From Swiss-Prot:
Organism this protein belongs to: Stutzerimonas stutzeri (strain A1501)
Family from the record: Belongs to the SlyX family.
UniProt signal peptide: none
PANTHER family: PROTEIN SLYX
InterPro entries the UniProt entry points to: SlyX (IPR007236)
Pfam family, one: SlyX
The protein's name in its UniProt record: Protein SlyX homolog
NCBIfam families reported for this sequence: PRK00295.1
HAMAP family named in the record: SlyX
Amino acid sequence: MIVDLESRVTDLETRLAFQDDTIQALNDVLVEQQRLVERLQLQLVALAKRQEEMQGSLGAADEDEAPPPHY
């Protein structure tokens, strides 16, 4: 009876140790993914700003041009 309980406690302690390791590994991956998401968000904002600037400069150039002769 005592041996069985000791075995069960040892098994539970082993499982707990593996669960702690798994939780830490998952947390590390989550932190890495969050950093990646933040970098991607910054890149997206920069690309959107760049696109707006390019569209603005193209729009201004189009307004200065005379209409084609068929108008």
